[in-house]
Amino acid sequence: MKFLLRLLSKLLCRIKLFSNRLYYIGGNDALPPPLSKDEEDDLVNKLVNGDESIRSILIERNLRLVVYIARKFENTGVGVEDLISVGTIGLIKAVNTFDPTKKIKLATYGSRCIENEILMYLRRNSKVKAEISFYEPLNIDWDGNKLLLSDILGTDNDCVYNLIEGEVDKQLLLFALKKLNEREKRIVELRYGLTGVGEKTQKEVADMLGISQSYISRLEKRIIKRLKKEINKML
């Protein structure tokens, strides 16, 4: 990993953005084009068979993907060079964890890892502060528990819904769900419509399971934390 990060640093120092093309600084040579399916299959097979030098080739040939995704976040106030650096870390993770037996293209898997890495970076470095307390009690539910603003507003657990959008993310999520017990699985299925019957609110799930909304909220936060931990193990 240290070798790859050193390689990344050298590559990024040589990259400049110009119009719609990417060039190495100090020359007129454009970055290499994306891999064709046959090229990718050949390189991945060599990597699987122990040729570690292939990693750097896969990274360099997918740098255009990093730049493309990084540019989508230009309006966040973070410099595009920083976004490219962070995104390339996601690409490195993708190359290191890519499983060709899943029948998913490296570019597809890599794009989600790149985007997730950038999103996590933006969340960690966000300077936006809420001007109201997320822990201000709003009400008392029927079993005497305080219902907090943080219980009903969307937080990082909304990323679970976003994780369902792509095929790669579906597989990651379904694998992580296997780590939950039956009640936890049921709550996630109901809240995020994984059974095809539509999403349920916390109150609806609470009524269906015969427990309070505040308890559902606490369970959901614990479940989301565990799912994110399991998914991060695979990235």
UniProtKB/Swiss-Prot annotation:
Give the top-rank taxon of the lineage listed in the UniProt record for this protein: Bacteria
Q: Kindly state the positions of the motif Polymerase core binding in this protein.
A: 82-95
Q: Which InterPro entries match?
A: Cro/C1-type_HTH (IPR001387), RNA_pol_sigma-70_dom (IPR014284), RNA_pol_sigma-E (IPR014200), RNA_pol_sigma70 (IPR000943), RNA_pol_sigma70_r2 (IPR007627), RNA_pol_sigma70_r4 (IPR007630), RNA_pol_sigma_r2 (IPR013325), RNA_pol_sigma_r3/r4-like (IPR013324)
Coiled coil residues, start to end: none
Question: From the UniProt record, which GO molecular function terms apply?
Answer: DNA binding; sigma factor activity
DNA-binding region in chain numbering: 202-221
* Gene3D superfamilies linked to this entry: 1.20.120.1810, Winged helix-like DNA-binding domain superfamily/Winged helix DNA-binding domain
Q: Which GO terms describe its biological process?
A: DNA-templated transcription initiation; sporulation resulting in formation of a cellular spore
- Keywords on this record? DNA-binding, Sigma factor, Sporulation, Transcription, Transcription regulation
**What is the similarity comment for this entry?**
Belongs to the sigma-70 factor family.
Q: Relate the protein's function as given in its record.
A: Sigma factors are initiation factors that promote the attachment of RNA polymerase to specific initiation sites and are then released. This sigma factor is responsible for the expression of sporulation specific genes.
The name on file for this protein is RNA polymerase sigma-E factor
Native source organism of the sequence:
Clostridium acetobutylicum (strain ATCC 824 / DSM 792 / JCM 1419 / IAM 19013 / LMG 5710 / NBRC 13948 / NRRL B-527 / VKM B-1787 / 2291 / W)
Which lineage?
Bacteria, Bacillati, Bacillota, Clostridia, Eubacteriales
Encoded by which gene? sigE
